[in-house]
From Swiss-Prot:
This is Acyl-CoA thioesterase 2. The keyword Lipid metabolism applies. Has been used in the engineered enzymatic high-level production of enantiomerically pure (R)- and (S)-3-hydroxybutanoate, used as a building block for the synthesis of optically active fine chemicals, such as vitamins, antibiotics, pheromones, and flavor compounds. Chemical synthesis of chiral 3-hydroxybutanoate (3HB) is not economically feasible. Thioesterase that has relatively broad substrate specificity, hydrolyzing primarily medium- and long-chain acyl-CoA substrates to free fatty acids and CoA. Functions in the thioesterase-dependent pathway of beta-oxidation of oleate and conjugated linoleate ((9Z,11E)-octadecadienoate or CLA), which provides all energy and carbon precursors required for the growth of E.coli. Disruption phenotype: Deletion of this gene decreases the growth rate of cells on conjugated linoleate but not on palmitate. Deletion of this gene also decreases 3-hydroxybutanoate, 3-hydroxyhexanoate, 3-hydroxyoctanoate, and hexanoate in medium after cultivation with oleate as a sole carbon source. Inhibited by iodoacetamide and diethylpyrocarbonate in vitro, but is insensitive to iodoacetate treatment. GO terms for biological process: acyl-CoA metabolic process; fatty acid catabolic process. SUPFAM superfamilies: Thioesterase/thiol ester dehydrase-isomerase. The gene is tesB. It comes from Escherichia coli (strain K12).
């Protein structure tokens, strides 16, 4: 396991304060606030700690209410909404400075047989031979602002290989579609619940910026503000984050200073394992 992956697993492994109450640390990725995927992953960890082990998260719906401070810990307060014969529901509040910054409602279910069908995986080049985002960042290190340089060129917990590179510092006009391959940078423990909250973390990577592509804007360009409003995810089938997953993302709308994106995770052999939807603020202050 790489040190970067070990650090992320430690970050997402919360300290239990008392029943239903957890504390998580924050990481600074060089962004303007706490990375949304961190809050999602930590909230999923907190929620799963309160349900029977055989019940796995199959969906969550969340709202980001305030920017999180990457220099302060976050408290996660888990409320039990229901424990039924088949499903468990939890509501999680993420709190900083005495105020909620995020709410999540998550539903859990034990594996159960039933009807099966899925969308066909879109075509995409294989990940072999594609450069990783870290390799791309290292090749562009001389162009990176000092505040971002160390964050972007360091070893990362997840290896991300874009099919087409979109420069966050200088965008180019493109169709609102993006495909990236993602896998863990090292070996994730053999526990599907761990893989699920790691994928929750990963689901916020290469997501909302896709809505900027038709406008030729990179999300780190001066004067550009983007921030998640809500983020939802559905886990359809088991998966292994030690193996490549294709994250296929599209933006179907942008209006009223908001961008809308949706994505799908597929295994290399075409199994649809998860779906995502997000809406966020997109403003050009220039």
């Amino acid at each position: 396991m790489s040190q970067a992956l070990k650090n992320l697993l430690t970050l997402l492994n919360l300290e239990k304060i008392e029943e239903g109450l957890f504390r998580g640390q924050s990481e600074d990725l060089g962004l303007r606030q706490v990375f949304g995927g961190q809050v999602v992953g930590q909230a999923l960890y907190a929620a799963k700690e309160t349900v029977p082990e055989e019940r796995l998260v199959h969906s969550f719906h969340s709202y980001f209410l305030r920017p999180g401070d990457s220099k302060k810990p976050i408290i996660y307060d888990v409320e039990t909404l229901r424990d039924g014969n088949s499903f468990s529901a939890r509501r999680v509040a993420a709190i900083q400075n005495g105020k909620p910054i995020f709410y999540m409602t998550a539903s859990f279910q034990a594996p159960e047989a039933g009807f099966e069908h899925q969308k066909t995986m879109p075509s995409a080049p294989a990940p072999d031979g594609l450069p990783s985002e870290t390799q791309i960042a290292q090749s562009l290190a001389h162009l990176l602002p000092p505040v971002l340089k160390d964050k972007f060129i360091c070893d990362r917990p997840l290896e991300v290989r874009p099919v087409e590179f979109h420069n966050p510092l200088k965008g180019h006009v493109a169709e609102p579609h993006r495909q990236v391959w993602i896998r863990a940078n090292g070996s994730v423990p053999d526990d599907l619940r761990v893989h699920q909250y790691l994928l929750g973390y990963a689901s916020d990577l290469n997501f909302l910026p896709v809505a900027l592509q038709p406008h030729g804007i990179g999300f780190l360009e001066p004067g550009i503000q983007i921030a998640t409003i809500d983020h939802s995810m559905w886990f359809h089938r088991p998966f292994n984050l030690n193996e490549w997953l294709l994250y296929s993302v599209e933006s179907t709308s942008a209006s009223s200073a908001r961008g809308f994106v949706r994505g799908e995770f597929y295994t290399q052999d075409g199994v649809l394992v998860a779906s995502t939807v997000q809406e966020g603020v997109m403003r050009n202050h220039n």
